[in-house]
Amino acid sequence: MTDKSSSNLVPVNIEDEMKVSYLDYAMSVIVSRAIPDVRDGLKPVHRRIIYSMHEAGNHASKPYRKSARIVGDVMGKYHPHGDSAIYDALVRMAQDFSLRLPLVDGQGNFGSMDGDAAAAMRYTESRMAKVSYKLVEDIDKETVSFNPNYDGSEEEPSVLPAMFPNLLVNGSGGIAVGMATNIPPHNLGEVIDACCLYIDNNDIEILDLLEVVKGPDFPTGSMILGISGIRSAYLTGRGSIIMRGRAEIENIGNNRQAIIITEIPYMVNKARLVEKIAEMVKEKRIEGISDLRDESNKNGVRIFIELKKDVVAEVVLNQIYACTQLQTSFGVIMLALKDGLPKVMNLKEVIAAFVSFREVVITNRTIYLLNKARDRAHILLGLTIAVSNIDEIIRIIKASNDSNAAKQELMARQWEALNILPLVKLVDDKAMLNEQGKCNFTEVQAKAILEMRLQRLTAMEKNKLEEDLKNLITEITEYLNILGSRTRLLEILKEELIKVKEEFATPRLTSIEFGEFDQDIEDLIQREEMVVTVTLGGYIKRVPLSSYRAQKRGGKGRSGLSMRDEDITTQVFVGSTHTPMLFFSNIGQVYSLKLYKLPLSNPQGKGRPMVNILPLKANEHITNIMPLPENQDERDNLNIMFATAKGNIRRSDLLDFKKLQSNGKIAIRLDEDDKLIDVKPCKEDEHILLATKAGKALRFPVESLRVIKSRTSDGVRGMKLAKEDSVISMTVLKGISSTKEDRDAYLSVPWEQRLEIAKGEAFNPEELGVSLTAPAIVEMANSEEFILTVTENGFGKRSSAYGYRITDRGGSGIINMDINDKTGLVVGVMPVKMDDELMLITNSGKLIRCKLESVRITGRNTSGVILFKLDDGEKVVSVSLIAETAESEEDSELEEEGLEQSEEV
């Protein structure tokens, strides 16, 4: 290396050089490529395309031109980058599904919502859209500054004098270095109304702007769920907006329905959406779809989803929302360049920046027009003086040797200006007046006089000259008023905005559904009573309650399940499609789910494994499902009572399980040889009844247990068990305040009479032969509960809850049912009402539904009556109650086959 070359080298620290170079690169990307300007809402490439088309005269009123020519002009003059980047930007500005107000009018294939690419630029044609002219209007009036292009051969505008807030109307998106922007499109009319509100009151609150700017207005329509994301975006510049496609449900006959999707969320690929739905159906994550086809055409989107027979369309639609991009979110980052620097702005700041920019544009335009008007008035003043002194003017011209001599003579001569002195003052043309108040022609005026045609000397032309001068003076006066009054300037700004609104505003496409939608999608689900069935093998299903018909006690039943021999039903309960449920597993985890999300089936259907519905771990299975009240306030006042097979109990606050993650939450710690028997909601003034398979029961108050906050506690001893015995049921009863003596006295009244008293029938206390007063008897009758006990061999009975004395927890309990080999062990104990119905399921899947009014009420220490005829080897495995419904009332003709009166044992 020579000394000369080495002397040109400057040693630098590589760390410093990296910092400087990377910062330069980052700012170049931010300012010159990826981030739009808050004033016109355009990135450099879009601005250059619009300006180049305007310069080339490629306006909306002119014929289309090849897109390749437009791209070539932009690339050659202003944007020395790849032609594909320019063409892609041009294509997007022509897509009516990408921009709310397309800025380019394209002819040919400009892509589709399916993600199809546009045709090559040599095939497509383009021109400016009509609204695009509002971006460049007045650009020739020195409204914005110009900068040299990349090689200094041309000049390009640093910003377009946009007459509407394009950043909000069409939105923008881009990824720079270390930052990104994602601004949704809005409705032009709403945005202009917001600008007018801001012009009227610069101190307006953002929430007041939200009264007119309802939210984004996407070109693809669809819906926005809730306003919390909108408020966050407009207040802070950042937020997440939930978008949902629009779908309709149609009846297509034969108990079949179809879902018709007519609008999809913004920027969602329609073809990919259809593929995703098909994929979810194949994976059985979406059930009930029999056919799927895309029937979209030039008239709009139409995705046809045909459903299987008797499938609830709302459920399938919600599954589609949950599993596909038919419902997605738009992350708002309102980042734009303000004064050349990137800044996240709220709605008011964006509008304020635009209004401030338009003030500058109108001011610059007014100054330009004022100067032009004064220049023209200057000439007209000279012509007016010349016409008034035409004879002398002609003499000077005739006496001059040439035009230059004539011009110099005209300029040297002083002319009387008394008759036009007021006009000169209005025009503010001080150059024409000397100290004596006389006028001297300027070179411009002298030249105009020499070029004046003789026809201007006619009387009509003289009058026209004076009229033109007066009109110019009016214009100049108006321009001076604008420049001297900000109020007048803002009036013009508003007038121009309103004109743009009147010409280009369109109705809102995107509707906003108000409310909270975290858990409210079940509002689309029809309220229907469902029977939920759970099997030992971990299968679960829901079946409409109307699918089961009522039978009388002793009937043979109907097939309720179609299962393999090794699978049996373990739990059945009835709830609404809107019922929230907690799922408790064998390892002490708890999960949350709404009932309508369970797979819909028929009485013979097997259902679906719970491992496919809940995120269960290896060797984990659900042991208990607890339906909760639908009312949130009612749930907030409840506790949860846990009961295990070994007799342990624990009282917890239901609020501890209010918010559950998708992967569940620890509910209780269990010993290896113990299992969770039941979990039920309870209140402070209620009682707990634990029942064992050996026919024992223990009743104690809920308030005797303290609330345990630790979810990892295994609780305290609830009941002392004999060897081989275990707890099989936990029942929540009403609290009672009567004494044992009063309860015993009340129970001495025949149960038939007690039921009549509870119905409001008149009675004579003396005839009952008890020491209780009539009000006490009525109160106890109205509060009386009955306990149903069912055994594995189909025996059952109802007993008054008053017969179960209240003791402390931890005892051995009292006899609940007299069991023997004929009755078998107890499988279910629960409180019942007179109008309830009983549902029993056997290990073979057979099911019977009968009214409880046919089950006799007996004493506590009895064996009951036969409820269900069993075949050899058949056992009752599940017991559930069904409240009386419209379906059962309609089914008044009950089956009479195989009915037998059973006798009390």
UniProtKB/Swiss-Prot annotation:
Originating organism: Rickettsia conorii (strain ATCC VR-613 / Malish 7)
Assembly behavior: Heterotetramer, composed of two GyrA and two GyrB chains. In the heterotetramer, GyrA contains the active site tyrosine that forms a transient covalent intermediate with DNA, while GyrB binds cofactors and catalyzes ATP hydrolysis.
Catalytic activity, as annotated: ATP-dependent breakage, passage and rejoining of double-stranded DNA
Domain (Topo IIA-type catalytic): residue spans on this chain: 35-524
Protein function: A type II topoisomerase that negatively supercoils closed circular double-stranded (ds) DNA in an ATP-dependent manner to modulate DNA topology and maintain chromosomes in an underwound state. Negative supercoiling favors strand separation, and DNA replication, transcription, recombination and repair, all of which involve strand separation. Also able to catalyze the interconversion of other topological isomers of dsDNA rings, including catenanes and knotted rings. Type II topoisomerases break and join 2 DNA strands simultaneously in an ATP-dependent manner.
Designated name of the protein: DNA gyrase subunit A
Gene Ontology cellular-component terms listed: chromosome; cytoplasm; DNA topoisomerase type II (double strand cut, ATP-hydrolyzing) complex
Record-stated family: Belongs to the type II topoisomerase GyrA/ParC subunit family.
Sections of the chain in a coiled coil: none
Active site: 123 (o-(5'-phospho-dna)-tyrosine intermediate)
Enzyme class: isomerase
Subcellular location: Cytoplasm
SMART domains reported in the protein's UniProt record: TOP4c (SM00434)
Residue positions of motif GyrA-box: 551-557
Gene3D superfamilies given in the database record: 3.30.1360.40, DNA gyrase/topoisomerase IV, subunit A, C-terminal, Topoisomerase II, domain 5, Topoisomerase, domain 3
PROSITE patterns recorded: TOPO_IIA
Assigned EC number: 5.6.2.2
Record region (Disordered): 885-905
GO MF: ATP binding; DNA binding; DNA negative supercoiling activity
PANTHER family documented for this protein: DNA GYRASE SUBUNIT A, CHLOROPLASTIC_MITOCHONDRIAL, DNA GYRASE/TOPOISOMERASE SUBUNIT A
Record's keyword terms, sorted: ATP-binding, Cytoplasm, DNA-binding, Isomerase, Nucleotide-binding, Topoisomerase
Major place of residence: cytoplasm
A biological process term (GO) from this entry: DNA-templated DNA replication
